[in-house]
Amino acid sequence: METGQQFLMLKNSININSKLSFHLFNDGFFFNSNSESNYFLFEDINLSIENELLNFLKFNDINNSNEPKIVFFDSPSMFIPSKLHDHKNSKQFLSNYTGLKSNHKVVFDITDDEKICVIYQLNKEIEKTLTKSFTKLNFKHYTTILYNNLKEYSKSNSDSIMKLFVNLQKDKFDLFLIKNQNLIAYNSFPQSNADDFMYYLFALIEQYKLSENSFDLLFLDRIEVFENYYSTIKNFHDKIIFLEKEEALKVNNDHPSPYFLNII
């Protein structure tokens, strides 16, 4: 049952706003600048090879005085309360959650509210070439950005209703369960169709014993390619909200995580 679409504004005050950014995925990267906005495969432009990166930057008229934002999508992250996190144990924490990749190192972000350490893996070769190419860099995992944005949204929408936020991506999706501005749960699940999405979504709903009227379900954006997902969930839950921004939605089917097109 659907009570009618609701559209709310997601504050964008803490978003990555620089025009220059690299979004790193397993098979390639999405590059955004004043002159270029496209997805490139590593087999065509390998960022871990210094000459290839330098030629690419030269072609796009980018020099080392720029400060690009490097956003990592190529490995999962783990959320640890800051008060429980010892940076010396980051590798051990993460190894209990996901397999550690060769030629990667374990790093972490601190969320803006300083409550969460986001632990993840970073490709050392790509870090090396980027560091040589720019004087200053800003590294961040995409889930850190999501958390910061959702906490900012929660500040202006501080009712006591539990909120389950959904970030749909090409082959996975993220769930953030938040109540009274506090993170209750975060997880990321694989998906290739609406059935996968529904399975994992309701598994989390059942795990936290959420009754139908006890929470709002909020999608970060309304993306055309996921319309059948929205239609399916509307048959089971009536508190559905789409977070829309003032800016027009950018459409680029090559970006594996469409929400991030709106904040680059």
Which positions does each model-derived feature cover?
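Hydrophobic/aromatic-enriched cytosolic interaction surfaces used to assemble or bind macromolecules
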Residues: M1-I264
